[in-house]
Amino acid sequence: MPAFDIVSEVDNVELKNAVDNATRELATRFDFRGVDASFELKGENIKIKAEDDFQLSQLVDILRGNLAKRGVDARAMDIKDAVHSGKNFYQDIDFKQGVDTLIAKKLVKEIKASKIKVQAAIQGEQLRITGKKRDDLQAVMALVREGDFGQPFQFTNFRD
């Protein structure tokens, strides 16, 4: 029986490249000359630092642009609130890895409501979709792409 998995993961190499490119762009920007601003990548967490709240939003925009250039979906970003400490503002950005249980349940509910003849099973941080016809599986892929679940999804392990 044909099957595939729905996963949500961020490529760490592309994430590192995007942060490096954003740091390079930050060094060449005229409005950040003489300003203490930086990006710091630790695992799947990026810590940004700037002297002003407005500059933090500019840094997030720079990062979003570089993520888009590298093919990383910006919907995977989980932006925390800005923290003011001393003369600097700090902000943490986490990246969502894996399909959260609540989102997985919402996906299963949406797939069942569409009346497509497939079975959806939650397996840890991924969803396994199984059906008799490849066309049904492709219809589920289109349904997931169209839906707004607040998280990007990838389709892996397609079996015939």
From Swiss-Prot:
Pfam families: DUF520. Belongs to the YajQ family. One of its GO terms (molecular function) is nucleotide binding. The lineage of its organism: Bacteria, Pseudomonadati, Pseudomonadota, Gammaproteobacteria, Vibrionales. CDD domains: YajQ_like. Nucleotide-binding protein. The keyword Oxidoreductase does not apply. HAMAP family: YajQ. It comes from the Bacteria. This is Nucleotide-binding protein VF_1240. GO terms for cellular component: cytosol. Coiled coil: none annotated. Keywords: Nucleotide-binding. The keyword Transmembrane does not apply.
